[in-house]
Amino acid sequence: DSLVQFIHQERYDIVMTLVSQRAHSLVAFNWRHERDALIQLAEKEGISYEVIDGTVPAERRKDIVQRFQAGQIRTLFCHPQSASHGLTLTKATTIIWCSPTYNAEHFQQFNQRIHRAGQTQKTETILIQAKNTWEPKVYKKLNTKLGRMENLLHILKEVS
């Protein structure tokens, strides 16, 4: 679409630099314009990729996961809501969050896609944030939510 302008080009450049330095990675995007910018850069740089978001049918998603796990795809661009449950993506060793999310459950569950049985390598999660924006506050709020979730689960374990 000729009306689209990517205003966070540096963000996408950083993400793709990180992707190019790793064998297999997952990149979480929250917005369609992020997905589109990442796809554009991956194609420009010749990086093999697939997308998992709400537009991808279940059978295609299954095929994408199998090809990724077989090493045929270098990176997956994923919307966390569409890829945070039921997928094992242990071929990846890195998760890169292109921008912050407020949703603690999606954040936690998406990060667990590479921390599963079958993961034999060291893993990392990278959070991209812009200085002098609301993004550091969002990540701080997200960490607070995660702490509360962990405390609640601990209390529930003690009660049961």
Predicted region positions:
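A conserved SF2-helicase RecA2
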Residues: 102-160
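Conserved Helicase C-terminal RecA-like lobe
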Residues: 1-76, 81-87, 153-160
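Short, well-ordered beta-strand core segments
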Residues: 76, 95-96, 114
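A short beta-strand element within the Helicase C-terminal
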Residues: 87-100, 124-127
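Cofactor-binding loop segments of dinucleotide-utilizing enzymes, especially the Rossmann-like FAD-
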Residues: 30, 54, 100, 128-130
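Short amphipathic alpha-helical segments
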Residues: 38-40, 87-91, 108-109, 139-140
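Active-site acidic short loop of glycosyltransferases
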Residues: 70-73, 91-92, 120
